[in-house]
Amino acid sequence: ASNLAMALAKKYRAVMLIDADLRNPTQIRLLGRKAMGKEGLDRLLQGTDLSENRVMQAAAYDEETNLVTLISETPCRNAAKLLASPDMAELLSVVRKTMDYVIIDSSPMGMFADGDMLADVADHTLLVVRQDVVSACDINDAIDAISQGKATFLGCVLNNMQTGSLLSRISGYRYGYAYGYGYGRESRGGRSEEGSR
């Protein structure tokens, strides 16, 4: 999500990255403290004021990357409740007015319903897939779940692909979701045994 958001922001577009993985926020680790605004997404959704002014004050802007970020720093126990609330839809409605693109990072598909809930309030969805982690059957199940939302499913993005391995493993047909980040247990091969996005 952060790579896509930064690539779009380099085109001098107004881009906001929202870390909606409230269970295990990872964007703070990827982007650093400069990406943390005055308030995290969780605190913003628990408040009563979702005006454009308040939302933009809560977010952080990085002049170097031209990226606006709205992220959380610590895990939130009531993530599903906050993401399913009318406030999340209202927040997206507010930022759509000022941003050209709003990129939302969610928790892994298949482990939590967060991605399904966000697919109901987003315009489009992409499934980020990491090679050799989860079976093609699980990917198809995730696509089916996403496709039932209101957002248009745009497709999959292959992440962490090993050079030359696609052709050599075409018969194996195993790919995985680009996540992990503390959700799955590590297997002997260093791959997450569970956790999909």
List each language-model region with its residue ranges:
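P-loop NTP-binding module
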Residues: 1-197
